[in-house]
Structures are given as structure tokens and as C-alpha cells.
Amino acid sequence: MAFKVGRDKYEPAAVSEQGDKKGKKGKKDRDMDELKKEVSMDDHKLSLDELHRKYGTDLSRGLTSARAAEILARDGPNALTPPPTTPEWIKFCRQLFGGFSMLLWIGAILCFLAYSIQAATEEEPQNDNLYLGVVLSAVVIITGCFSYYQEAKSSKIMESFKNMVPQQALVIRNGEKMSINAEEVVVGDLVEVKGGDRIPADLRIISANGCKVDNSSLTGESEPQTRSPDFTNENPLETRNIAFFSTNCVEGTARGIVVYTGDRTVMGRIATLASGLEGGQTPIAAEIEHFIHIITGVAVFLGVSFFILSLILEYTWLEAVIFLIGIIVANVPEGLLATVTVCLTLTAKRMARKNCLVKNLEAVETLGSTSTICSDKTGTLTQNRMTVAHMWFDNQIHEAGTTENQSGVSFDKTSATWLALSRIAGLCNRAVFQANQENLPILKRAVAGDASESALLKCIELCCGSVKEMRERYAKIVEIPFNSTNKYQLSIHKNPNTSEPRHLLVMKGAPERILDRCSSILLHGKEQPLDEELKDAFQNAYLELGGLGERVLGFCHLFLPDEQFPEGFQFDTDDVNFPIDNLCFVGLISMIDPPRAAVPDAVGKCRSAGIKVIMVTGDHPITAKAIAKGVGIISEGNETVEDIAARLNIPVSQVNPRDAKACVVHGSDLKDMTSEQLDDILKYHTEIVFARTSPQQKLIIVEGCQRQGAIVAVTGDGVNDSPALKKADIGVAMGIAGSDVSKQAADMILLDDNFASIVTGVEEGRLIFDNLKKSIAYTLTSNIPEITPFLIFIIANIPLPLGTVTILCIDLGTDMVPAISLAYEQAESDIMKRQPRNPKTDKLVNERLISTAYGQIGMIQALGGFFTYFVILAENGFLPLHLLGLRVDWDDRWINDVEDSYGQQWTYEQRKIVEFTCHTAFFVSIVVVQWADLVICKTRRNSVFQQGMKNKILIFGLFEETALAAFLSYCPGMGVALRMYPLKPTWWFCAFPYSLLIFVYDEVRKLIIRRRPGGWVEKETYY
């Protein structure tokens, strides 16, 4: 990867493999650090002779075909190595054995273990544990397939983004031009590019003619950059004589020598940097892991306690082991895995409808816990198309609308000066609308030409009608295209107005250069001499527009006198035979890539949600700061150090940096900063703009934010954003303007490229976190009425009140739909007004949730179930005290004369029917108390009466679980299949008082929380 390999020293021997295969990880880290460094190359400093010596290329004939073939064999094809993709089967296994699924697998294995112990020791073992094991395995496999399918669907959409067009490149070999596949281009090749081509490799330009390239995907500059053979800057990314792989040539032609191909290009290094970064664990995965620890802890603690207890109570070892396994399995919430998966999927679908495509389900929640967003400027915060913002004519600044439909244009369009200015802007302009777009709105039409000229073309077309007709009336005779030495563009046209001279010369260019060529100025349609006062007015206007971060162009014209330039005069542009001085200055037009309409509002929402928005851009500081102020990243009244210095009229060095809330950091300063200095900036400034940053620096900024403990979202569209996208906790790429590399690296894609969609994402993410809490609280509560019957069965030696099969009916049957319905619950308060959650303290499942679900609501539910159990047995003659210690006889199939409290004798078959009826009734009681639990889980702080019952899915869930319970109880044949028996209608009502008690208890608890915020009740029970 070392960059300064002089190619003259590049003997094949130097390409030996790494000698030592040891320390592979260390090497990888070293490579990553190497990639994070700035680009170092020296080809831009070499003279043409030195280039010829280094690459052995004839500068007019190119390489020989034989030499090219040799180099191709040595270096490999000129293509980026695709990032290593995870094989599908590994992705599938991750779904099957990741996190929560492991808990269920362990449960299933324990069940099979228990069953095999029973099968080995009993003559007619019960099949409950076998069923349970099979069901648990099935649950994991089905939910695994489901989430795998969800993610595979997103990656299918990803595949469709890949543009499979094989690129062609025009090379010169053996002195002949030939078009070859771009992958066959080799180092040392002589390549020609013209407007509209993609640059096939990193080129050192040796000759150019009006060549401009669009580097925005690499550096983030929205303006096309001039390319010429001149060495203009030490930094290879800034110099004019290097053109980069995969950027686009927008106009002109150039010829260059290939200096790097494939992965060794600047673009290739960035792509490699992105694919080599490991993304960390998502916040929701960490939460689920934390939750599993809690549940496992509770399960093992209960299991071991009762294992010891059952040994003390003189059960056999085998029985005690069966109990241990039973308790651990009873603690596993079987339905929860499916619930969480479905909730995340629903949110992902909801986000897709709002133009956010989520690539992996866990990223859905990450956006909700985001505390810092690092956003790219070009194309994300702005529209990525230059638009005319202001004009200066008649000695005053006029505003053009920069809204996306340009509705704000309200200046005097009848002024003679404006007519002259618009005429120059339309004629001295090579941009044209592409064919067949007459029925599209002007601003939506595609233009062939560079960004500034397109902006002028659209502006003039909007204000003055068809530019094409204007150009036909004023036919062009000759032109001098823009070049970097004289910094102007000029053309001479036939003038159709008979009252004026025949030829009109129009010129545009850098304002100070244009003004130097003028001796008069047009004011209100009259020419006046250009005096010092007007020059000052020009200077002030120029500075004001430049200070707004706008790109300013000057315009002037001259009517060529007929006596010197009669009709048919031969104008010569090489040996100029017409005046290019003493022209008449007409005005200035300034352009900017304006903010998207919805962005300021979105930034405001982020700020009120406690999210810090940082702008990270490759563009110039002045432009970056202007846009940051325009969209509210630097808010009204907040000053940078430079602003304070200017206001107090003191040097910048005397200002205390802590006084400035806002801060604009230049990439070159960032280069020399230590991590500590960067941390200081991130800590002490609330509003930050990083300008002129390289891709490597974007990555360093993200790492800096993460060191502060922030959860970072990064938005971007260029290749230059991809390393940062990959490193961030959640990378957000742009769907329309985004490059393939950035889409690969991101976790989420904004299909409409609109920054405002991120706010929607944050809102959905926060909502799903709240709703998952509610869902989990609901699901866990029924664990207590499921476990306690088993514990009492062991301790008090009573007939088993609730069987394994019935537990499954609750977890995978009646509780599923209600738990999922909580995902549709609306937010209780304004989610977007609170601070982001602290991942260290604000957990998905915390001790308070467990204590509320298990210790409070769950206990009331268990009481309801036992009450029903004792009522049914008492109605059948077994009073509660008589049941103590009855278990051994009750479960013995050879004893057929067990007596009840009234002396009646019961056979084994009869006893079991009563027991199974009790199981069914206990099950129904749990359903009844879960009604109340579902309703109270709708809110965590508000009263249910404030929240209302608008959630239709939840109401459906209530009816669905009741209907399912009734079906399981009364459907003929259930006695055989699930050992469920029909109940007397009165037995349904046993648990009603407990259901009501739960509702009242929780409403009172929430009332106290609302009345006494921060009090004891809130600290102990608010999850």
C-alpha cells in the first residue's frame, strides 16, 4: 500500500509476498492506519521528462501493446476489489444462533435432556418436555427464516443499484488511438478523455484544452474543477494536473498518463478503507444481550434455589434435575423473539413508506438513540445544483429566488440594464437544454454544460423566455472559451437590432478581471464613466455576495463600431483583432448550491430532540459556513471566533475559544490536531462545521464523536463519505445521488435524498424503543403466573395447577398478537422534545421493568390463577388444605381410590380430567388478567384515559386472544390433542376482580408518578 514506490525501482522482484505470515491482525491494523493517512504521491511534481523516465511511456505514441500486456499481468485489472461479502449461509446462521435465539436453543436442548431422563427412568413417560423442545426449536427456526428473509429483501434492492455498464476508455498504444475496456487500462498508458467521460484511472495530465472535472463524489466540491498540465498545489487532491479515477469530465478534453490503477487509486484506497472497517454492535443488539443476561440470571437463580429446596424436601436426584430444567425453561419467554422481530419489521416497513430503506433490522432503532449527526453538505443539505441567488445591477443587489421552484423572484425585470445583463448571460454561455424536455418544468430539465452555466441558463429561461430563440436571433460569429490564464469567456454575435451597431461583443468571467477591462458602466440603461465611487460600490457588492458563500461572475459588453467592423469582418481569436478592453460593465450574478427546502426545519427538530448536527464537507469554509447559517446548523446569534474578533476589532489570537459557541474548522488545521484538541472542539462547541475535509478526516471526526460516548449517524452520498458511513453507528446514504460505494457502506438509504427523512427516522426509532419496552413488559408479566404453579407444586406437593402445553398456548398463542399490537401504539408525549437516551443508563430492559412485571403485576396475575384453581377443585370436593401433600398419590396411576374432603373416591382417570380442567381454567384466568396488563402497558407515564384506545390493532388483539382461549377450551377433540377441557361459564369470571385490581393499581401508580416527578415511586417503578 505504500504510495511512494518509484516505478523505476519497480522490479518484479519487489512484488514478493509479505515474508512473514505471522501477525496478520497487526498487519491489518497497520494497513488501516496507513489508509487513514492522507494521500501521498509525487507524480504531480514531476516534469514531463521525469514522467517519461519513470513510466517508460512515449508521450505521443503511448505504450506498446506488448508492454501494456506485461504490466496488466503484473498489476492485475484496473478495477476495485469488491468488498468481501458475507456468504448467505453465514447470514442465515447468524439469524438462527444470534443473541436471543441461543437462549431458546439452550431451552430446547434442556427439554430434550429432561425427556430422555424421563424416558430412561419411567415406564410411561409424559411427552410434555418432548413437545416443548420441538416447539422451541420450531420457533427459533421460523423467526430466523423471517428476519433472514427481511434482510435479504433489502439486499436485493441493494443489488439493483449496481450499474453494470462496462466502461470504455480511449488509450493511445503504438501511436494509434483505440477504445478498450477500462479494466484493461494499465499504469503508464496514455489516455484521452473528453466531456461526458468517466476518468478510467488516476491520471497525470500532460495536455488539456478547457478541461473541467466534477470531483464532487471524491472531495465534495460542487463546482467543476479545471484540469491542466500545471503543478499548482503540494496537495495532490488540490493540484490541477491530477485527474482521479471515477470522477467525471464535464467539458473540454485532456490527455494524461495513468499513474495508479484499481485499488491503488485514491478512490480505491477510500473504498478499501471503507470495506476494512468493522462496524460495532448496534445499540439494540447490546440491549437484547443485556436483557438475556437478566433473564438468564433470574432463571438460573430460581432453578438452582428450587433444585436445592427439592433435595431438602427429599425428592430424588432425577426429579430434582427435571424440576431444575422445568423452571429454567418456564422462564424463557418463547414468544418474545418473534415479537421483537415483527416489531422491528413493522417499523422498517413504515420507514420505507416514508422513503427510508433500512438494510438491517437492528438499524431501525439505532437512529432513535442517535445523539450526533455528521452530515455531508453537497446534495444532502443542499440541492446539488447551482442556482442563481443574487444579481447586482443599477448599483443595487437584487435577490433571485433559490427555492426549489424558484417562486421568490421579484425584481424589476423591465430595467434596460437587466435586459442587457440577461442577454450577456444567455449568449456568453455554452450550456444547452438536452432534447425533448419541453413539457418538463424548467428547473427539472437536464442541461449539457457546467454547473454555473446551467444555473444561468435556467435563470434566464425562467425570467426572459426561450434562450434558444435569443441565440438564434443573435447568431454567434466567434468565441474564446474560458481558460484559467485569462479567466474570461468571450463571444461576438450578430446584432438584429437595426438601431444599434451590427456586432455585439459579450464577456463574462471573474469579477475583478472583468472590471479591469471596463472603462464605463451601464446604469438604468445609460452608459456612464466608471469612477472610484462606482468601483467602491462594485467592491462592496462583490465582497457581500462572496461573503454569503456564493460564486460571483462579472458581465460586460461592447457594441463594435460598424465603420471598423463591417458585415463579414473576419474576427481572429488567435491573433486578437478586436477590442477586449474599455468595455462597458453591466453587472454581477452570483450563484450558490442552495439548501433543500425542508432542511432548516429538520435541523431545528434535531436540535429540539437534543441531537447535535455537525456539517462535514469537502467544500470551502465560506460556502460551508453560509449554508450552515442558512439551514440553522449555526443558529442565529451564535458566533465563531472569527466573528467575535471582527466584532470587537481584535486579532483572532486574543479571543478565548470557549466564548464562541460555533466553530468552523479547516481541513488543513485538522491535519495538525491531536486527538485531545479535536475532543476539546467537539466538547466545548455546540455548533461545528468542518470544511475542506478529506475522506480520512471524516473518519477521524466520527471516531472523535464516538470517543465522547455519542451514538453517531453519518449522512453522505459520495465515495468520500463511505469510510465514515461504515464507521458510524448508523450510516445513511442517498438513494438518488449516492454512489454505489456509499450505498454499500451504509445501513440505511434515503430514497428521496432528503435530510428531512432522517428526522422521521429518528422519531420512528425512538418510538419503537418505547414500544418494545411496553411489549417486553407485557410479555414478561405472564411469566410469573406460568412459573409459580410449578414452584408451589414442588413446595406444597399439590396437584400441578398449570401444565407445560398450556404455557406454550399462552406464550405462542394468546400473547403474540397483543404483544405485537403494542408496536402500533402512538407516542405518549412529544418524543422529539426529549434528549437522546443514554445507552449506559437508559436500558431497554432495566431492573425497574423486571420488578414491575415480575414483582407487582405478575404476582396479582398469579393470585388470580390460583384462586380459579382452588375454586374448581373445591367445587369438585377437594378443599384447599386437603390438597397439601396430595401430589404423590394423585400422580400415581396405580392408585384408584384417592379420597376427597367428603370421602368420595376418585380413580386416576377421573382425577386427571379434573386436573386438566384446572389447567384450562388457569390458562383462561391468565388471558383475563392479561387483558388488563395489555391496557396498562399502553402507557408508561400517562393515564390510559389520556392516551385513549385509538390503537385498532390492540383492540383486535384483545378480541383475538379471548377468541383463541375460548376455541382451545370448547373445540371438540382438544381433550385429546392438548388436554384442554370445556369450562363452566362461571369459571371465566373468577379472575375478573384481579384484572380490575391490576388496572386500578397501575393507574394509581402512574398518577403518583405524574404528581410527584422524581419521587420514590418514579425511581422504583418507572421503566
Curated annotation (Swiss-Prot):
Q: Where is this region: Mediates interaction with SCN7A?
A: 596-717
Annotated positions binding Mg(2+): D717, D721
Reaction catalysis annotation: K(+)(out) + Na(+)(in) + ATP + H2O = K(+)(in) + Na(+)(out) + ADP + phosphate + H(+)
| Primary enzyme class | translocase
GO biological process, alphabetically ordered: intracellular potassium ion homeostasis; intracellular sodium ion homeostasis; potassium ion import across plasma membrane; proton transmembrane transport; regulation of sodium ion transport; sodium ion export across plasma membrane
Q: How does it sit in the membrane?
A: Multi-pass membrane protein
Q: Provide the protein's localization.
A: Cell membrane; Basolateral cell membrane; Cell membrane, Sarcolemma; Cell projection, Axon
Which parts of the sequence carry N6-succinyllysine? K661
Regions that span the bilayer = 88-108, 132-152, 289-308, 321-338, 773-792, 803-823, 844-866, 919-938, 952-970, 986-1006
Post-translational modification (record)? Phosphorylation on Tyr-10 modulates pumping activity. Phosphorylation of Ser-943 by PKA modulates the response of ATP1A1 to PKC. Dephosphorylation by protein phosphatase 2A (PP2A) following increases in intracellular sodium, leading to increase catalytic activity.
Chief localisation class: membrane
Per the record, GO CC terms? axon; basolateral plasma membrane; melanosome; membrane; plasma membrane; sarcolemma; sodium:potassium-exchanging ATPase complex
Give the matching SMART domains: Cation_ATPase_N
Q: What name goes with this protein?
A: Sodium/potassium-transporting ATPase subunit alpha-1
Per the UniProt record, the source organism is Pongo abelii (Sumatran orangutan)
